């Protein structure tokens, strides 16, 4: 009986390593050519995925940089625009300062020589008109013209049989264009028939 037990033990011991070898062989057999191809394809897909992920990250970073650059550009142009609007009249005002200087000179002469005051005022008037002309400010012709509500504002009406109705008789306050827009309408007196 002991021999049988020994044989069984030997046989059992011998079977176990064989079983292990069989399992390994089964595992190796499971990975056949088709499975190897699938594994290779999976590796290729993984490589492709990683490449696409890298490209995605690169493009995302590029987008974020461009977005930040554009945001900085927008902020900078807004600041420049605000500064430009804040100081837009500065050059025009610099041109007006000599006009003010001439007025002050003319006023200094008011007690000594009235003719010098008149000459100073005339000079200042010409200088101011020249500056306005340089900035495309032009007078609106009103006297003798047909009344135009876009250019004139009627303050008074006078009955006149010798003129056509709605003719500007008198310009009370001069009107001006700035480029092609009315800066200020002319204040006028208009004719009316009885």
From Swiss-Prot:
Listed GO MF terms: adenyl-nucleotide exchange factor activity; protein homodimerization activity; protein-folding chaperone binding; unfolded protein binding
Localization per record: Cytoplasm
Entry's Gene Ontology BP terms: protein folding
Record flagged with keyword Hydrolase: no
Lineage top rank: taxon: Bacteria
Basic and acidic residues: compositionally biased ranges: 1-24
GO cellular component: cytoplasm
Keywords assigned: Chaperone, Cytoplasm, Stress response
Residue ranges, annotated region (Disordered): 1-41
Signal peptide: none
Database matches in CDD domains: GrpE
PROSITE patterns listed in its UniProt record: GRPE (PS01071)
Keyword Translocase annotated: no
Record note on quaternary structure: Homodimer.
NCBIfam families: PRK14140.1
Family affiliation: Belongs to the GrpE family.
Role noted for this protein: Participates actively in the response to hyperosmotic and heat shock by preventing the aggregation of stress-denatured proteins, in association with DnaK and GrpE. It is the nucleotide exchange factor for DnaK and may function as a thermosensor. Unfolded proteins bind initially to DnaJ; upon interaction with the DnaJ-bound protein, DnaK hydrolyzes its bound ATP, resulting in the formation of a stable complex. GrpE releases ADP from DnaK; ATP binding to DnaK triggers the release of the substrate protein, thus completing the reaction cycle.
Protein name, as recorded: Protein GrpE
Species whose genome carries this gene: Carboxydothermus hydrogenoformans (strain ATCC BAA-161 / DSM 6008 / Z-2901)
Native organism taxonomy: Bacteria, Bacillati, Bacillota, Clostridia, Thermoanaerobacterales
Gene: grpE
